[in-house]
Amino acid sequence: MYSSRILKYEGRSKFGSSCARILRAKSEIPAVVYGKESDVLHIKINSNEFDKKFAKFTDNTVLLLNDGMVEKCVFIKDVSENLTKKFIYHIDFYEVDRTREIERDISIKFIGASVGVKEGGTLSVLRNTVKVKALPLNLPEFVEVDLTPVKKGDQITLKDIVLSDNVKLSETDENLAVLFVK
């Protein structure tokens, strides 16, 4: 399950623009790992491996950086890239403790066609995200809401969103409407 999230890395001891250019010429990307309770770690990642996986990542994708001995649980904080050349200059990662729950805003994906809309109603989406709490490796990248059973006059609230057992809703008012059909 997590194989698409694992990236191999190596430490690096040389810094600066010229060293970064040399790394990029070898198809490696210079990167930095930041964390609340750890020192900054300077690393390099194979650009081909990262490019293959990068398109599938979201803001909530938890990655596992592995150097063969140590595995770090991280989010992508920033990617410096040249979009015209499709070239990545540098990556910043943020390390999190895999044993502590974190709160994140997760995208809501709406699937299906609402019965109410088919009957001529208008679908109004009020929220595209929901705040959840989970261990980093249990954090979903998005949640799905099926619109199929929603009729005219119906609404879907935060408490109607189905989450897995290891993910909790972290909103103050779970009766807030996510969408309604008028």
UniProtKB/Swiss-Prot annotation:
SUPFAM superfamilies: Ribosomal protein L25-like (SSF50715). Keywords: Ribonucleoprotein, Ribosomal protein, RNA-binding, rRNA-binding. One of its GO terms (cellular component) is cytosolic large ribosomal subunit. The keyword Ribonucleoprotein applies. Pfam families: Ribosomal_L25p, Ribosomal_TL5_C. It comes from the Bacteria. Transmembrane segments: none annotated. GO terms for molecular function: 5S rRNA binding; structural constituent of ribosome. CDD domains: Ribosomal_L25_TL5_CTC (cd00495). The keyword Ribosomal protein applies. GO terms for biological process: translation. Belongs to the bacterial ribosomal protein bL25 family. CTC subfamily. Part of the 50S ribosomal subunit; part of the 5S rRNA/L5/L18/L25 subcomplex. Contacts the 5S rRNA. Binds to the 5S rRNA independently of L5 and L18. NCBIfam families: bL25_bact_ctc, PRK05618.3-1. This is one of the proteins that binds to the 5S RNA in the ribosome where it forms part of the central protuberance. This is Large ribosomal subunit protein bL25. It comes from Borrelia duttonii (strain Ly).
